[in-house]
C-alpha cells in the first residue's frame, strides 16, 4: 500500500511532520548535512521515510535491521545514499511483548495520543482495555478510548460509563468511524504536527477510522473488513504499521489488530491505571505489603470499608503479577510508584 504524500501541495515543514524542540536539541554540528526523516512504514526488509523533500526508501547499515525502528521514529539520513546514520532518542515509544518472543516488539514511536479502539459489542473487554491503558501510560502517550458500533448497541451509554471508570481523567468518545463527523469529534487530538496511533482488536473500525481521518489526503485508502456477528471478531485488514497524513494537519499510525497483549516493564503504567490502589500502598504498615494478609494493610481496609472495588483489585493483582513475571528487573514493593518520570525514551 503506497504511503500518503505531503500534507499540502507544497513541501511540508519539519513541524508539519511532527518535529519539535525535543528532537532539535539532539542535533550536533556534525549532523548539518544530514536530512531529518520520519519513519513512515516498516517492512520486514526495508524502511520508508518522509522528509521535507518527500517520500524516500531508506538504506540501513549492514549490522542494522528494520526491527530496530518503529513507525514515527526520527532518523538522520545521508542525502545521496539515503543511508540512515542514526536514530534520535524517542519522546515516547509503544511496545508490546509478543507471546513466545525474546523481547518486546516496537509498535510506534513519538506518539502524542493513543486511540484505544473497541466496539459496543462482544469485543468490549475491561481487562484488555486496562492492558492497553497500562501500555499507553508507560509509553508517555495520552490514552483516549474510542467506542465504535454504538448504533447497534442497546445501551451505548453503559459501555461509555464502564470505559470512563477505568482511569482518572480518561477521555472516552463514542463515534461512527464511517461518517465525516468522526474526524471532528477527534479534532482536539489531531492538530497540526500531532501524532496519534490506533490500537485495538481486528474488526473494530481502525482502518475505517484511518480513512475518515485522512480524508482526501490519502491516495490509497486502507482496506476494511466486516466482523462476524456471533462473536464480534474481525479479519486482519492491516498487516503493517504505517504513517498517514490527517486532513487537519496531524498524523495517524495504524497498527495490525491484536486481541492478546502481554504486559512487561509497565510498572509506572499500572500504577497510573490503578491510582486508587497506588495511593493506598504508602499507608500500609509494612513497606513490602502484598495487600493480601498483612496487618495494617490500607488496601484491605479500603476493601472492607467498601471504598475499593474487589474486582478492580483482582485485576490489578493479576496484571501486576504478570508484569513482575515478565519484567527482567523489578524493583520496589508492589504498588509503589516508579521512581522515573512518565514514559520511556530510547
Swiss-Prot record:
Q: Where is this region: Disordered?
A: 317-346
Q: Which UniProt keywords apply?
A: Cytoplasm, GTP-binding, Hydrolase, Metal-binding, Nucleotide-binding, Ribosome biogenesis, RNA-binding, rRNA-binding, Zinc
User: What family is it from?
Assistant: Belongs to the TRAFAC class YlqF/YawG GTPase family. RsgA subfamily.
PROSITE patterns, per this entry?
A: ENGC_GTPASE, G_CP
What this chain does, per the entry, is described as: One of several proteins that assist in the late maturation steps of the functional core of the 30S ribosomal subunit. Helps release RbfA from mature subunits. May play a role in the assembly of ribosomal proteins into the subunit. Circularly permuted GTPase that catalyzes slow GTP hydrolysis, GTPase activity is stimulated by the 30S ribosomal subunit.
The record's Gene Ontology biological-process terms are: ribosomal small subunit biogenesis
Q: Per its UniProt record, what PANTHER family does this chain match? A: SMALL RIBOSOMAL SUBUNIT BIOGENESIS GTPASE RSGA (PTHR32120:SF10)
| Cofactor remark | Binds 1 zinc ion per subunit.
| Assembly | Monomer. Associates with 30S ribosomal subunit, binds 16S rRNA.
What EC number(s) has UniProt assigned to this enzyme? Answer: 3.6.1.-
Report the enzyme's class at the first EC level.
hydrolase
Q: Which cofactor does it need?
A: Zn(2+)
Tell me the ranges covered by the CP-type G domain, including all copies: 98-261
Give the chief site where it resides.
cytoplasm
Q: Which residues bind GTP?
A: 148-151, 200-208
Q: Which Gene3D superfamilies match?
A: P-loop containing nucleotide triphosphate hydrolases, Probable gtpase engc, domain 3
**Can you tell me which residues bind Zn(2+)?**
284, 289, 291, 297
- Mind telling me which GO cellular component terms the entry cites? cytoplasm
UniProt xrefs under SUPFAM superfamilies: P-loop containing nucleoside triphosphate hydrolases
Q: Name one GO molecular function term.
A: GTPase activity
Record carries keyword Metal-binding: yes
Please report the name of this protein according to its UniProt entry: Small ribosomal subunit biogenesis GTPase RsgA
Does the keyword section mention Nucleotide-binding?
A: yes
Q: Where in the cell is it found?
A: Cytoplasm
Read off the HAMAP family from this record: GTPase_RsgA
Amino acid at each position: 500500500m503506497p504511503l500518503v504524500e505531503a500534507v499540502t501541495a507544497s513541501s511540508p515543514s519539519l513541524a508539519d511532520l511532527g518535529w519539535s524542540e525535543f528532537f532539535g536539541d539532539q542535533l550536533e554540528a556534525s549532523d548539518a548535512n544530514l536530512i531529518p526523516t520520519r519513519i513512515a512504514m516498516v517492512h520486514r526488509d526495508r524502511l520508508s521515510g518522509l522528509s521535507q523533500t518527500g517520500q524516500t526508501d531508506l538504506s540501513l547499515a549492514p549490522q542494522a535491521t528494520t526491527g530496530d525502528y518503529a513507525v514515527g521514529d526520527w532518523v538522520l539520513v545521508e542525502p545521496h545514499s539515503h543511508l540512515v546514520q542514526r536514530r534520535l532518542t524517542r519522546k515516547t515509544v509503544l511496545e508490546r511483548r509478543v507471546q513466545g518472543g525474546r523481547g518486546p516488539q516496537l509498535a510506534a514511536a513519538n506518539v502524542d495520543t493513543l486511540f484505544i479502539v473497541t466496539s459496543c459489542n462482544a469485543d468490549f473487554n475491561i481487562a484488555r482495555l486496562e492492558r492497553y491503558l497500562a501500555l499507553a501510560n508507560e509509553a508517555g502517550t495520552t490514552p483516549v478510548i474510542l467506542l465504535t458500533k454504538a448504533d447497534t448497541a442497546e445501551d451505548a451509554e453503559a459501555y461509555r460509563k464502564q470505559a470512563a471508570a477505568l482511569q482518572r481523567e480518561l477521555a472516552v468518545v463514542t463515534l461512527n468511524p464511517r461518517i465525516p463527523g468522526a474526524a471532528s469529534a477527534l479534532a482536539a487530538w489531531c492538530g497540526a504536527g500531532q501524532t496519534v496511533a490506533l490500537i485495538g482488536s481486528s474488526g473494530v473500525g481502525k482502518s475505517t477510522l484511518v480513512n475518515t481521518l485522512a480524508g482526501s489526503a490519502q491516495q490509497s485508502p486502507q482496506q476494511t473488513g466486516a466482523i462476524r456477528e456471533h462473536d464480534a471478531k474481525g479479519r486482519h485488514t492491516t498487516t503493517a504499521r504505517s504513517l498517514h497524513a490527517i486532513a487537519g494537519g496531524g498524523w495517524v499510525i495504524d497498527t495490525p489488530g491484536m486481541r492478546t497483549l502481554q504486559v512487561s516493564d509497565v510498572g509506572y503504567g499500572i500504577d497510573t491505571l490503578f491510582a486508587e490502589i497506588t495511593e493506598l500502598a504508602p499507608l500500609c504498615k509494612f513497606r513490602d505489603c502484598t495487600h493480601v494478609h498483612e496487618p495494617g494493610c490500607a488496601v484491605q481496609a479500603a476493601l472492607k470499608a467498601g471504598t475499593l472495588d474487589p474486582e478492580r483489585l483482582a485485576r490489578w493483582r493479576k496484571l501486576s503479577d504478570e508484569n513482575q513475571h515478565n519484567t527482567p528487573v523489578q524493583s520496589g514493593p508492589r504498588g509503589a510508584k516508579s521512581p522515573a518520570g512518565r514514559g520511556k525514551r530510547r
